[in-house]
């Protein structure tokens, strides 16, 4: 009887250790073969290294695996042109929004997919995934917003974390507001930085793809010098276009002194301030007024603006991020900018304190409470854009679901073992009493 009890207990321990594995299954990267149309292996796209890339010469890329593929993930070096492909009976289409990181869930598992990529496109990696939950690092971007609650206007990739701190994790990740990020410069001359940009945004809860301007990243040590680098009329018009396109209730911009004195930060703030006075005027840039309509931003905050100051509380735990605070998430977002890990860091203290902002412009009065960019804005004032709801599919007629114990044989076995252990223990105790 003691031997039986030991066997049952051992089986119970083994079964218990298997339960977390069932609950923790996730999709892994599948081993796959990538070949060009002429049959040549394309190793550059399967090394999981963004620094190796391939200039596609045209034709079809074939992705094959011995295991069922349920999703494909493409990493581009530059925004791709539209492209198509097939995976079984499913037609794939990509490149519509120029996403550098594109994920495609497949309707049915396949072991072979064919992608017709544009000639001259430059790709870094192609991943195939199997059944299960995708890893957190796989980014499933949505297009830029048609209507934003909050527009964040950093100058460079990493400024959004360094100087705007917990803005994105708190408002986008925790509160679920529609946050659009628009960068004044681009980093195409440093091809690793756009990837870092996307990784950082994804980390802090941004899900709508960012906008990157056509202005090349350059350094200036003053506002006057920055004005020699860019066409100011073009820059102001671009700022107006962003305000009209996204129609934000709140805009967050840079310090007019450029935080640590960066002239292009100053220039971004200066052209934004000009644009705020022009975006509601239909006679200014009539082409964008015709395309998007005009817009007068209700509230604008600038980093470190001395008037009407507020100090944001980025120290509260956020349930959306497992209890991490907004400033902790900002630091994790900045950590994705591997190339920028020098002497800058996200600081919630000191001269560049990422918590400190000032209400530069308001159509709804001054803040009384402070600590919330949306103070004095009622819920009806924003989030007024709703995407069209899909037509509901008719519910299929189905048989009643079987009992849960039938669909979870492991738990049935577990319950049986527990009962057997209890019975065995009772028999042992009964035998001992009889001997006494």
What would you call each of these model-derived segments?
Residues 13-17, 423:
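Hydrophobic core
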Residues 17-26, 403-411, 429-433:
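Sec-dependent signal peptide cleavage junction
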